[in-house]
C-alpha cells in the first residue's frame, strides 16, 4: 500500500511538472494518462495471475485433503480385516498427503493476503487514474481558455492599427459630423421662424400703437392722456393775436409729430 501511495505522489508531481514545463500541456497530459493506463493494465495482469495461483493452490489443498481422508478410511478397512501392514501403509500415505495439504494451506493463506493487497492497490491506482483524468480535463480546459484569451488579447491589440478599425473610426466621425450639421441646421431653421414671427409681432404692435395715436390726435387728445379726460372748450379766437403765432404753433406740433414718428420707427 505504501509503495502505491509513493507512486501516486510521484505521478502527481511529474504530472504537475510536465504541465508547467511542456509547450503543449494537452498532449503531455494525454500521454501521462496513457502511461498510467498501461501501468494499470500490468497491475491487473499481476492481480489476475495471483488469483489464478491462489485458485490452483486451493484446488490442490482440497484434492490432498480428500485423498488423505480416503487413505484414512482404507486404513480403517485394513484394520477391520486384520491387515495391519496394509493399514500401516495406508496411514503412511495419509500422513504424506496431510503434510502436503498443510503446506498448501500455508501457501494459500499467503496467496490470499497477497491477492487482497493487490486488489486494494489496484483499486487505489484506478482511483488515482480517475483523479488524474479529472485533473487532466480541468488543466486542458484551463490551457484552452488561456490560449483563447491570449489569441483574443492579441487580436484586440492589433485592432488599433488595423485598416478595418480605422474605417470604423472614420465612419463614426463622419456620422457624428452629419448629426451635428443636421442639429445645427434644425436650430437655425427654428431660429429663423422665431425671428420672423417676432418681427411680425413687433410690426403689428407698432402699427396698432400708431393707429391709436392717430385716432387720439384726431379726437384732440395728446399722447398719454386718457380718453375719459374732459376736453376744455376752445377759447374764442382773439383777433388781436397775430396770425404768425398760429403758424408757429402748427410748426411746433408738426415737429413734435415727426419726432414721435421717428421714435416709433426706431422701436
Swiss-Prot record:
Where would you find this protein in the cell?
A: Cell inner membrane
Keyword Iron-sulfur assigned: no
Q: Which residues form a coiled coil?
A: 26-156
Q: What happens when the gene is disrupted?
A: Essential, it cannot be completely disrupted. Cells with very low levels of protein have no ordered thylakoids, are barely green and are non-photosynthetic.
Disulfide cysteine pairs (residue numbers):
none
Q: Which domain of life is it from?
A: Bacteria
**Main function:** Required for thylakoid formation.
Q: What is this protein called?
A: Membrane-associated protein Vipp1
- Organism of this sequence: Synechocystis sp. (strain ATCC 27184 / PCC 6803 / Kazusa)
Amino acid at each position: 500500500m505504501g509503495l502505491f501511495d509513493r507512486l501516486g505522489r510521484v505521478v502527481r508531481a511529474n504530472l504537475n511538472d510536465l504541465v508547467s514545463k511542456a509547450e503543449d500541456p494537452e498532449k503531455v497530459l494525454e500521454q501521462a494518462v496513457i502511461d498510467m493506463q498501461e501501468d494499470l493494465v500490468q497491475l491487473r495482469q499481476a492481480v489476475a495471475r495471483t488469483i489464478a495461483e491462489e485458485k490452483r493452490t486451493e484446488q490442490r489443498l482440497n484434492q490432498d485433503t480428500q485423498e488423505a481422508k480416503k487413505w484414512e478410511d482404507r486404513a480403517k478397512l485394513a484394520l477391520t480385516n486384520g491387515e495391519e501392514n496394509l493399514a500401516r501403509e495406508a496411514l503412511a500415505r495419509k500422513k504424506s498427503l496431510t503434510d502436503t495439504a498443510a503446506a498448501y494451506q500455508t501457501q494459500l493463506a499467503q496467496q490470499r493476503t497477497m491477492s487482497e493487497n493487490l486488489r486494494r492497490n489496484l483499486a487505489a491506482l484506478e482511483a488515482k487514474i480517475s483523479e488524474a483524468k479529472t485533473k487532466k480535463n480541468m488543466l486542458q480546459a484551463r490551457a484552452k481558455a488561456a490560449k483563447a484569451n491570449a489569441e483574443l488579447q492579441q487580436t484586440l491589440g492589433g485592432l488599433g492599427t488595423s485598416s478595418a478599425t480605422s474605417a470604423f473610426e472614420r465612419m463614426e466621425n463622419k456620422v457624428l459630423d452629419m448629426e451635428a450639421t443636421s442639429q445645427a441646421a434644425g436650430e437655425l431653421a427654428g431660429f429663423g421662424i422665431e425671428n420672423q414671427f417676432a418681427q411680425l409681432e413687433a410690426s403689428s404692435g407698432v402699427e396698432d400703437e400708431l393707429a391709436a395715436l392717430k385716432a387720439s390726435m384726431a379726437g384732440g387728445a395728446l399722447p398719454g392722456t386718457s380718453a375719459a379726460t374732459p376736453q376744455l372748450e376752445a377759447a374764442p379766437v382773439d383777433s388781436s393775436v397775430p396770425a404768425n403765432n398760429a403758424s408757429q404753433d402748427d410748426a411746433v406740433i408738426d415737429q413734435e409729430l415727426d419726432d414721435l414718428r421717428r421714435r416709433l420707427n426706431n422701436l
